[in-house]
Amino acid sequence: MRIFNPFGRNTSRTIQFITGLGKQTRRSHNKSFTIDNIATILGGRNIGDEYFIADPELDFYDLDVLAVGPVAPEVSGSFDQFWNHELSYPVSSLAEQVPIPEESKEIKAKFDEFISDQQQTEYIKSLKNSEFAQVFRSGTQEFIWGPGKIVADDPQKLTTDIDDKTYHLSEELGPYLNEVNNELLIFSPYFIPGKAGLAYFKKLRERGVSVTVLTNSLASTDVPIVHSGYANYRRQLLRMGVKLYELNSQLNKEMKKGKFYESKSSLHAKAMVIDRSIVFIGSLNLDPRSVVQNTEIGIVINSKEIADKFAMYFDKKVDSIAYRLELRIDQDGFEHIVWHGSGDVEDRTLYWEPHTSFWERFSMGFLRLMPAESQL
């Protein structure tokens, strides 16, 4: 195991975070799972209970793609770049104390016992008996075939100036985004378009392109300060005619059927659908930190069948999982954002952030004043 761009051991993490902002906080945000250079899974999912419906407090809604063929060794090649990079350190070189053999045996025994106990839980039994697991074990899983292209940041991105785009994934995605003709669907848990993004969306809207964004609400986000950065752009986006949807953090019991907890829901999927013919799925959020600071990876799939299914599923489900935002002007000429719930979401209109307290809204208003957008 290796750790990419870790904090140093001779200075406290807090001091490094404060004094090294823009360097020590830059990280590998890539997510991939590749087996024998044959198959690879890409998306936004981390390894943790909350990403697999196993956390009683938080339930991340994520998206993955399983790909086979030439793209698998491409992902392995990207992984090797990071593994062999000068910023990657073996865990043993960072450990303050290496366990002695007896301790290692004890730790392994406890781990094996834990794994054995988990096999009898309702959660594991449900996974093993799920429809997907049964189909996969039987070898009858059907694939949709189409050309795919891996787009990934080079680890050198973290060693060069942030204005140097040579190693940026965005340079590979740019041509696809510049060729949008009719519709752009965006799924991004953290969405901060910035001035460049606003200019891009404005051009699309002037050409009559439909732009729809699904992101987190204040109640569903796990990083309120990032939501504050997004909130600064909502009115401008709505004025342009961009359709904004924010995930409902309290999906009703019908939506949660089959899950083990009534946990808070949060969007974690990162994807784009272009003209219902091209799909991007990966680790990239549309915010400054992902685009400029961190490294990311994803796949561009040129398949009308996949893109159309994806978009149709969104059309069918969005009103039952998210609030639609609207910009209203009152009788005094002041603009107000309202949140509409329909379908399975509460059928009502709200004039404040759904499922939030006064203190949460007040805190978010304060965070919006902080000049830290480049780090969000």
Annotate each predicted stretch with a short phrase.
Residues 1-31, 35-376:
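Charged, low-complexity intrinsically disordered terminal segments
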